[in-house]
Structures are given as structure tokens and as C-alpha cells.
């Protein structure tokens, strides 16, 4: 049995986690055509909640119809969606675990066909495409920006007060709408929403303030990916000062946590060969401090996760490790890591099969876990 700091308890929002292994938010296309979570989703999250005291973060969830930028992604704006999510939340809570919903708006990163089929147009902070040759979005006007802020707030209320989620994570990463305002590689505005570090930060911060006012500071997290070049991001000259300012403002709001992702994407370089001294987010981790949890994501495996908490950040108990792909294929991942049990391999070909349980809910639990199935949940 592991003695790693991975298995220390951690205060988190209004709860206490039994370990530091977190399910990553992942877009898996398992909602129906109307954005209602299918029954597979309840099974998926219940499986990964089976080790008591686990933190799960959901798929990216569209906050309103205009943000449903891909087919078969879930939403949180109507009663059918909220009711389906409540079933998911209740199942996770019955296992003694916790679940936060990720609030999402795609902006220029949406699938154009998915938008046009709904009579919607591509939009962003500025008229800058994701890449040369890609469709050019239109720039949001003042009224539309204010409406987006209200939509985030309503999405948070629907999640926490309607569906019973423990909290919400604002998706400010990976080149989606909040990131499109935050980074000058996309944001070319000259009004109060662009042109300076403070103005580029305004959209994300106004969303955060509104959501905090709606559901409470200890029910709000933020995900950022400063170094990711995915979807045209991560190329601005003043990247570190931009994110230093933004993170400082988030810390002053005393939100529940910060979630940082390293640049580890299919079409990008391995982060180990990137040479910028701040690339692995240590600067931002130090800025965040030790008072509130910080989630770190970036292709971690059992060994690198242990090194992260036992060596790199051994002086703090607030660093949690986010797993995506390994959690797909190992629903009992915290149990396996604690007991030193080998991980099952994942199958990329089944990551994104719409409306299907294949590669989603059919990975088995290990024998050692099943031997304890007479317990309501396994102690984390």
C-alpha cells in the first residue's frame, strides 16, 4: 500500500477529499442531440466515484444554446438537462464522493457546422480565426458580452441550486471563449475588454465575480492553460504577466481552487522538451499560495504524480493531480494507485464515440477492488 502524499486528506470547498487524485474534465460526446446527459454518463461518473472521497470534474458543459458548439455535448440551461445532471450528482454523492460541473462557452473554437445547423454564427473576442484559412468569427458587442456573463451566472445557479453540484469550474483554458479574451493572440480589442493586461482579464474576472456572488466563493474554481498552443493560444509576448495578474485577482476573490494544465496535447510537443523557465507552471503555483487547493494536469502517470506531490511540491498539501486518459480506462484509479496495481491501457479509438457506452462504461474494475464489493464504498 502506498504511503505517498497522494493519499493525504485535503480540505476542498465545503468538503474534505480523501486523496489528491482528480478526474479531469473531458469532452466525450455522450449527451443526446438536445444536450441532455444520457444514462451512460450517470454510470461513467458513478464508476469513477466508487472510491469514497474522490473529486470529479464533469465534461465541459454548454451554459446556453449559443455555446453548444459541438454535437452531443451536454448543457445546463433547461429543466431536462438539469434533471438528468441531478441524477448524476445524486449517484456520485451516494458513493461518498464529490462532483463539480465545468461551465463552458466555445467561442471561435466551435464546430461551424454545429453552429449553422442551429442558426448560430461563429463569435469571439475579436475577428481573428483559430488559424489561417479557418473561418473568421465576428467580434461580440457590449450587450452580447454582458449577456454571456449573465449566462455563466445562470449556468452556475442551475448546476449548484438546481442539480446539486458541489461547485462549478469556469473553463478558462484551451482556447475557448474566456481564453480568447484573456490572450492577445486572439483579443485585438481596444475597448474595456482588450488592449491591456487588465482589460483582457476583465471578461473572465467579471464572470468569476458574478458566479461567486451567485453560488459562493467556496463553490467556484477556474481552469487555465497558460502554455497550451492548442487552438491558437500560448503565443503572446506578455503571457507570464497576463496570467500573473489574472491569477492574483482570482486569489483575491478567494475562490475554491485553481486548475492549471500543462501543454500536453496530441499535436503538441511533450512539455519536457520545452525550455521556458516558467513552462511547467511553477511560477503560478507559487503565486497561488498554500491556502486553497491547486489542481495540476498534464499527462501524469502514477510515477510522475507521486513525484509531483512527494518531491516537487513536498512542502505543501494543496497540490492535487488531475488524470484524464488513465481515468478513462481505470474507473478504480485511486484504489489501483494506492495498492500499486497495474493500470489498464486506454483505447483512443473509443474516446469520442457519440451516444455510446463503448470505451466509456465498459472498462472493468480490478479483482482486488471487486473483492471489497460488499462495502458501500472503498475507503480512499
UniProtKB/Swiss-Prot annotation:
CDD domains: OYE_like_FMN (cd02933)
Residues annotated to bind FMN: 25-27, 60, 102, 171, 223, 299, 324-325
A Pfam family of this chain: Oxidored_FMN
Any coiled-coil regions, as ranges: none
Binding site for substrate: 171, 174, 352
Keywords: Flavoprotein, FMN
Alphabetized GO MF terms: FMN binding; NADPH dehydrogenase activity
Family: Belongs to the NADH:flavin oxidoreductase/NADH oxidase family.
Function in brief: Probable inactive dehydrogenase; part of the gene cluster that mediates the biosynthesis of fungal ergot alkaloid. DmaW catalyzes the first step of ergot alkaloid biosynthesis by condensing dimethylallyl diphosphate (DMAP) and tryptophan to form 4-dimethylallyl-L-tryptophan. The second step is catalyzed by the methyltransferase easF that methylates 4-dimethylallyl-L-tryptophan in the presence of S-adenosyl-L-methionine, resulting in the formation of 4-dimethylallyl-L-abrine.
Official protein name in the record: Probable inactive dehydrogenase easA
Native source species: Claviceps purpurea (strain 20.1)
Gene: easA
